[in-house]
C-alpha cells in the first residue's frame, strides 16, 4: 500500500470553473503509473515514474486551453515505512497495517502524518530534502530550550540524525493568515514572540537569513542572481544600522502559531537561531500579508513598538530580506514556483525604490 502525498503545485491556470473530484494514482508495476481524472472532461496526462532514489512522481496534464492546466509533484511513501518508523522508535509493536490509520497534514518543508494506533494518536514528521540548510542537532537543542521556557508543545522522539520527530497528537487550533486581523489573536502571537526575544535563552546557530541567500541562490538564473546581489546590499545596510542578537524563530508563517488550552504557542523550530528580532516581526508581517491592509499594518507596528523612522526603515529592510529568503527557498524546492518569483521581483523593486 502506498501513500501519495502532494508536495507542491508548480503552476495552475483555471480558465473555466471545473471540479476535480479526485485524482487516483494506481500502480501496476513499481515503475509504471496511470492517472484517472474523475471530472467533467478527461485530459491527457503524462507521468514520470519515480526513481528508487527520489521516489517522486511528476504528473503533468493539460486541457488544450479549455479547462485546466497543472503540474503536480507528489511524494510517494509506503505505509510500511511509516509503520517501520513506529516500530524502530518503540511507539508501537504492531506490524499489522490494518491497525494503523494514517492521514497527511498540510506542510511546506516536511511531510507530516497523523497516525492512529493502539487507541492513541501521534504526529509523525518526516523531513524534506534539505540537509544542506537545516542542522537537526541545533533544531533539537533549540526546540528543547523553547519547551523548557513554555514556548512550544512537547515531543516524544526527536532523532537529530534523521530529523524524524514524533509527538503525541494535541487537539490544537492552527492559526490562519486571516487570524492576525483579530486583535486578540494577533497580540497573543506578538506576546509569545516577545517572550522568546526577551528571554535569556541561547540558541545554537542554525539558519541565518543574513547568509542563506548566498548558499541557495542559483546564479545561473537571472532573477535569483539579481536577488542574491540585492541580499548583499541588504546585509551591508543592516550592518550599518546595527544588528541585535536574540533567540529567534525565523519562520513565522501562520501555521507555526497554534492555540492549545487557550494559550498561544510556536511550533516547528527548524529555522530557529540567534538573530535580530526585527527579522522575526518582518517575516511575520510579510508571510501573513500584513501589507495588503495599510490600517492593519500600522496598528500592528504600533503594537510591537515600531514607530520611529529609523525603526521602520530597519523593519522594512528586514522585510525585503524575508522576501529574498523564502522566494529563493521556494525556487530551490520548485524552480517554476510563481510565488517565489513574485517575491524576488518585489524584493528587487523595493531595493531599487529605497536606493540601497
What would you call each of these model-derived segments?
Residues 96-103:
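Conserved N-terminal boundary motif of the eukaryotic protein kinase catalytic domain
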Residues 77-96, 201-250, 254-260, 351:
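An alpha-helical support segment within catalytic cores of ATP-dependent transferases
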Residues 103-204:
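ATP-binding pocket architecture of kinase catalytic cores
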Residues 279-307, 320-338, 345-348:
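Active-site activation/catalytic loop segments of kinase-like enzymes and analogous catalytic loops
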Residues 2, 6, 16, 22, ...:
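Low-acidity, Ser/Thr- and Arg-rich intrinsically disordered low-complexity segments
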Residues 309-319:
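All-alpha amphipathic helical-bundle segments outside canonical DNA-binding/catalytic cores
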Residues 106-119, 123-124, 235-279:
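Active-site acidic catalytic loop and adjacent metal/ATP-binding pocket
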Amino acid at each position: 500500500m502506498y501513500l501519495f502525498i502532494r508536495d507542491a503545485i508548480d503552476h495552475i491556470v483555471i480558465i473555466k470553473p471545473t471540479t476535480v473530484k479526485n485524482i487516483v494514482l494506481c500502480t501496476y508495476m513499481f515503475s509504471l503509473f496511470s492517472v484517472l481524472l474523475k471530472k467533467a472532461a478527461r485530459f491527457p496526462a503524462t507521468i514520470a515514474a519515480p526513481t528508487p532514489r527520489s521516489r517522486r512522481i511528476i504528473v503533468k496534464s493539460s486541457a488544450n486551453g479549455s479547462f485546466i492546466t497543472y503540474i503536480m509533484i507528489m511524494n510517494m511513501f509506503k505505509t510500511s515505512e511509516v509503520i517501520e518508523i513506529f516500530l524502530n522508535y518503540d511507539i508501537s509493536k504492531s506490524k499489522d497495517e490494518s491497525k494503523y490509520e494514517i492521514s497527511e497534514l498540510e506542510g511546506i518543508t516536511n511531510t507530516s502524518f497523523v497516525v492512529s494506533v493502539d487507541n492513541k494518536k501521534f504526529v509523525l514528521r518526516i523531513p524534506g530534502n534539505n540537509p544542506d540548510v537545516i542542522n537537526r542537532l541545533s533544531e533539537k537543542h533549540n526546540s528543547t530550550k523553547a519547551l523548557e521556557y513554555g514556548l512550544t508543545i512537547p515531543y516524544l522522539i526527536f532523532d537529530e540524525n534523521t530529523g524524524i520527530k514524533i509527538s503525541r497528537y494535541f487537539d490544537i487550533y492552527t492559526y490562519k493568515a486571516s487570524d492576525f486581523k483579530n486583535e486578540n489573536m494577533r497580540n497573543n502571537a506578538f506576546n509569545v514572540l516577545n517572550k522568546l526575544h526577551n528571554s535569556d535563552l541561547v540558541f545554537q546557530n542554525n539558519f541565518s537569513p543574513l547568509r542563506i541567500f548566498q548558499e541557495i541562490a542559483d546564479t545561473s538564473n537571472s532573477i535569483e542572481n539579481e536577488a542574491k546581489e540585492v541580499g548583499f546590499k541588504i546585509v551591508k545596510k543592516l550592518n550599518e544600522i546595527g544588528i541585535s542578537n536574540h533567540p529567534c524563530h525565523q519562520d513565522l508563517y501562520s501555521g507555526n502559531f497554534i492555540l492549545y488550552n487557550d494559550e498561544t504557542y510556536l511550533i516547528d523550530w527548524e529555522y530557529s537561531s540567534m538573530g535580530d528580532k526585527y527579522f522575526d516581526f518582518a517575516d511575520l508581517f510579510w508571510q501573513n500579508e500584513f501589507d495588503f491592509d495599510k490600517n492593519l499594518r500600522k496598528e500592528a507596528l504600533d503594537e510591537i513598538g515600531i514607530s520611529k523612522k529609523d525603526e521602520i526603515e530597519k523593519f522594512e529592510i528586514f522585510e525585503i530580506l524575508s522576501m529574498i529568503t523564502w522566494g529563493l527557498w521556494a525556487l530551490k524546492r520548485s524552480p517554476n514556483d510563481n510565488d517565489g518569483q513574485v517575491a524576488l521581483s518585489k524584493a528587487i523593486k523595493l531595493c531599487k525604490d529605497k536606493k540601497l
